[in-house]
Regions:
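A short linear-motif detector with a strong N-terminal bias
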Residues: 25-26, 51-53, 130-131
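Active-site-adjacent betaalpha module
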Residues: 1-5, 42, 55-179
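Short coil/turn segments at secondary-structure boundaries
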Residues: 23, 50-51, 74-77
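Short, solvent-exposed loop/turn segments at secondary-structure boundaries
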Residues: 21-25, 135-137
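Short acidic, Gly/Ser-rich segments with clustered Asp/Glu that frequently serve as metal-coordination loops
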Residues: 16-20
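A short alpha/beta connector and helix-capping loop motif
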Residues: 4-7, 23-48
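N-terminal nucleotide-binding beta1-loop-alpha1 segment
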Residues: 7-14
C-alpha cells in the first residue's frame, strides 16, 4: 500500500510535440495534470524530467504552470536514472516509493521505472497517466514492468490509497479533482 509520507511523484517527458504525438494524448495530458494537482494537494515530493527540451520543447503548459517551485531536470539518456541530478533529486525526496507518469511508456518511463526498481525503490506506474505512440507499446511496457515487480495503479486508485480515510483533511481536495 502506498503511504502519503513515503511516496513521491516522478514526471517523465510530458513535452511539446512528443506529448501531442502519443496515443490518446488529450486524456494523457488531462490525467497527468490531475495527478500533479493531487500530488501537490497531498504534499508529495515531485521529481520532474525533460528529454532534450531544446529539441522536444518544454513540458506542456497545463503541467508546467502547476510547478513554479520546481525545476525540470534536463536529460539526454532514456532512463532518467542515468542523469546524476535526477538521482540526487530522488535521494533528496526522502521517500522509498514513487508513482511514475509520462511518456513514452515503452522507452523513458519503462527504463526509468525499471532502474528505480533495481535500486530498491517501490515503483508504481500510473497506467492512465502514461502513453506511447501506439497502444501496443504502452501495453508492452506495462506488462514488462509488472514482470519486473513494478506495480500498476490508476489515477483514482493511487489517490484513494494515499488518502485512506474519508475523514482525512486531504480527502475533499482529492475528491474535487476526480469528480
Amino acid at each position: 500500500m502506498l503511504e502519503k509520507n513515503n511516496t513521491g511523484l516522478i514526471i517523465i517527458d510530458v513535452q511539446g510535440k512528443l506529448a501531442h504525438s502519443v496515443h490518446e494524448n488529450e486524456a494523457l495530458i488531462a490525467n497527468c495534470t490531475t495527478l500533479v494537482k493531487g500530488a501537490l494537494a497531498l504534499d508529495l515530493p515531485i521529481v520532474w524530467a525533460e528529454q532534450i527540451p531544446q529539441k522536444l520543447g518544454a513540458t506542456v503548459p497545463q503541467i508546467n504552470s502547476l510547478l513554479p517551485d520546481h525545476q525540470p531536470i534536463d536529460k539526454f539518456t532514456f532512463s532518467a536514472c542515468d542523469e546524476p541530478r535526477f538521482l540526487d533529486a530522488i535521494k533528496s525526496a526522502g521517500v522509498d516509493s514513487f508513482l511514475i507518469c509520462g511518456i513514452e511508456a515503452h522507452i523513458c518511463v519503462y527504463q526509468t521505472a525499471a532502474m528505480l526498481k533495481g535500486m530498491g525503490f517501490n515503483v508504481e506506474v500510473v497506467t492512465d497517466c502514461v502513453s506511447s505512440r501506439t497502444p501496443e507499446n504502452k501495453a508492452l511496457a506495462i506488462n514488462k514492468l509488472n514482470r519486473l515487480g513494478v506495480q500498476s495503479t490508476g489515477l483514482e486508485m493511487c489517490f484513494y490509497e494515499l488518502v485512506k480515510d474519508s475523514r482525512s483533511n486531504s480527502f475533499k481536495p482529492i475528491l474535487n479533482l476526480i469528480k
